[in-house]
Curated annotation (Swiss-Prot):
Any one of the GO BP annotations: filamentous growth
Biased composition (Low complexity): 24-33, 92-121, 206-220
Stretches with biased composition (Basic and acidic residues): 1-18
Active site: 374
Binding site for ATP: 255-263, 278
Keywords attached to this entry: ATP-binding, Kinase, Nucleotide-binding, Phosphoprotein, Serine/threonine-protein kinase, Transferase
PROSITE patterns (UniProt xref): PROTEIN_KINASE_ATP, PROTEIN_KINASE_DOM, PROTEIN_KINASE_ST
First-level EC class: transferase
Organism whose genome encodes this protein: Candida albicans (strain SC5314 / ATCC MYA-2876)
Name of this chain's protein: Serine/threonine-protein kinase STE7 homolog
Alphabetized GO MF terms: ATP binding; MAP kinase kinase activity; protein serine kinase activity; protein serine/threonine kinase activity; protein tyrosine kinase activity
Cell inner membrane is among the record's keywords: no
PANTHER family per record: DUAL SPECIFICITY MITOGEN-ACTIVATED PROTEIN KINASE KINASE DSOR1-LIKE PROTEIN, SERINE_THREONINE-PROTEIN KINASE STE7 HOMOLOG
Bias-annotated ranges (Polar residues): 57-69, 127-136, 144-162, 221-233
Length: 589
């Protein structure tokens, strides 16, 4: 108790205006209320007596007025009496014209100059009303460069976490056009134009040509090749199925090579997918560059079970383009023919093959307005499942709506149609002619135009005769040796080719134009000693009509379901065909 009295005395000395703390009173068992109040009031003279009795009956001696009671219960506060104006936030606007815009866009009335909205405080649940006001120029008040945000009385009930920025309020609630911020931002960018900017590095994608864009609207093909970056390995342009990178491609073996490039079997390491990589050497000639881009474009846009699937392409710094495509493990038809029994394709295989080629040609022309222009055994591949696919669109030409015919002179001469040789306009029917010639070669095992029909020629001229030279190739395929071939190999080495030289090509072209079309009708198979299939001969004759106006289109030939193509779509020959394809696959291994 002594310690408490000492502390109270020290506190009292700090406040000189207060009287000293009186000593505690010893209260009896029944203390007097008046004495108790006197001790609690510290003996102050200005203390107003209060009654401790809670009963409604008041004593006559200690009665208080109602005004005194109210003053005690609700003490006055200077904060409540103070009349301070609401805070005004000055906000810059776009211009004087922007501030003088009528506010009818906000409230729906031309005389309205403020917006009221309610905001609920998540903590206390109190609804706080706020006012957004703008000085109106319609009432004669000159418009200033500021708008005012008026918050009623005080903002102490607003949750700070729920406060929205002024720009957002003006933009979302009052829909004001804050063009000043865009103006200041543009001014800042103009004034800081010397700051360094990061430019995104442009990558050239060779094959990502949108199929929806017309070729007329796109730029020319030649400048695209010339603008290719001279990097060591440009990124591979891929489809959506695979993400290719040149470092992820592992070469397994070489499949073949030609004048324009080579083909090899590769492995995509991340997916363990086997692919075929075609390397094309870029020539400085714009014609070669156009052919490369055309092949990439066609491969990228074609999606058909009868067309080889395209995975992507890349450009190397050694003037080569790498194309990754689907790998067909059985190879091309010219490699499959020597593996067949009797070096001839069975009739059921020829039916499946013809259906696949005509379906692929129909898809190319009807969907992309494309003619292949180079149908031959080298450009038809087969998988181990017996699926036939068209490839090598290097000399194909994409036709536009205004150009339905092509007038160029390219392709393999042996499979060219008469209208192409004569320099006439040709279309998709030219591929039908090439298909018929290829079927004769696969069915008989002997290349077309190889038989020497001019038996009256002298033997001394057989070395210079193109027919005899072609017959030497036929003898080679049958396992025989030809003296003319041995002499030619001594002169030209392994690069011996039939109809080599201007005279040979001229003889071949003259035969295609002047002689009757080749046929298997009424001919005997030299191996089986039996006539060829009747429907096969009829189908080949329809393909080899010399008058292209009478010759049928691929889709017209596919309509014949009762003769040559009977049972093909129904899968009558599927089991036998797959068994044959497996045998070919085993022979390839």
């Amino acid at each position: 108790m002594t310690r408490t009295t000492r502390i109270d005395t020290q506190e009292a000395t700090k406040h000189k205006d207060l009287p000293p703390v009186p000593s505690p009173l010893s209260l009896s068992s029944n203390p007097n209320p008046e004495c108790l109040m006197e001790s609690k009031s510290l003996g102050r003279k200005n203390f107003k007596k209060l009654s401790l009795d809670a009963s409604p009956v008041k004593s006559t001696s200690g009665s208080l007025r109602s005004s005194d009671m109210m003053s005690i219960k609700e003490p006055t506060s200077l904060r409540q009496k103070r009349q301070r104006p609401p805070p005004i936030l000055h906000l810059p606007t776009a211009s004087s014209s922007a501030t003088s815009t009528p506010t009818s866009n906000i409230t729906g009335s031309s005389s309205a100059s403020s917006i009221q909205f309610a905001q609920k405080s998540p903590g206390s649940g109190v609804i706080v009303s706020q006012t957004l006001s703008r000085p109106s120029s319609a009432g004669g008040i000159p418009s200033s460069g500021y708008s005012s945000l008026n918050v009623n009385q005080s903002n102490r009930n607003v949750d700070p976490d729920n406060v929205v920025s002024t720009d957002m309020i003006l933009n979302q609630i009052s829909n004001l056009d804050l063009t000043s911020m865009n103006h200041h931002r543009q001014h800042y960018q103009n004034s800081h134009h010397h700051l360094p900017t990061t430019n995104r590095k442009r990558q050239t994608v060779i094959s990502s040509i949108s199929p929806t864009k017309s070729s007329a609207a796109s730029s020319s093909l030649e400048p695209q090749i010339q603008s290719l970056p001279a990097s060591s390995q440009s990124p591979i342009a891929t489809t959506s199925s695979l993400k290719l990178n040149n470092k992820d491609l592992l070469t397994l073996k070489q499949l073949g090579s030609g004048n324009s490039g080579s083909v090899s079997k590769i492995l995509h390491i991340p997916t363990q997918k086997t692919m075929a990589k075609k390397i094309i050497h870029i020539d400085s000639k714009s014609v070669i560059q156009t052919q490369i881009i055309r092949e990439l474009r066609i491969l990228h846009e074609c999606h058909s079970p009868y067309i080889i699937e395209f995975y992507g392409a890349c450009l190397n710094n050694n003037n080569t383009i790498v194309i990754c495509m689907e790998y067909c493990n059985c190879g091309s038809l010219d490699k499959i023919l020597p593996l067949c029994e009797n070096k001839q394709f069975p009739t059921f295989v020829l039916k499946k093959l013809s259906f696949a080629i005509l379906s692929g040609l129909t898809y190319l022309y009807t969907t992309h307005k494309i003619i292949h222009r180079d149908i031959k055994p080298n450009n038809v591949l087969m998988t181990h499942k017996g699926e036939f696919k068209l490839c090598d669109f290097g000399v194909s030409r994409e036709l536009t709506n205004s150009l339905a015919m092509a007038d160029t002179f390219v392709g393999t001469s042996m499979y060219m149609s008469p209208e192409r040789i004569q320099g006439l306009d040709y279309g998709v029917k030219s591929d039908v002619w090439s298909t018929g010639l290829m079927l004769i070669e696969l069915a008989s095992g002997v290349p077309v135009w190889s038989e020497d029909d001019n038996n009256n020629d002298d033997d001394e001229d057989d070395e210079d005769d193109a027919y005899v030279r072609q017959g030497s190739i036929a003898a080679e395929r049958n396992g025989q040796n030809s003296p003319s071939r041995s002499r030619k190999n001594k002169q030209k080495g392994n690069g011996y080719n039939s109809y080599n030289g201007p005279e040979g090509i001229l003889d071949l072209l003259q035969r295609i134009v002047n002689e009757d079309a080749p046929t298997l009708t009424n001919k005997i198979n030299p191996v089986t000693k039996l006539p060829y299939d009747k429907y096969l001969c009829q189908f080949i004759d329809l393909c080899l009509i010399k008058d292209d106006s009478v010759r049928k289109t691929p889709w017209q030939l596919l309509e014949d379901k009762e003769h040559f193509f009977k049972g093909v779509e129904e899968g009558v020959y599927d089991k036998e065909h797959k068994s044959w394809a497996k045998k070919i696959r085993k022979c390839k291994v």
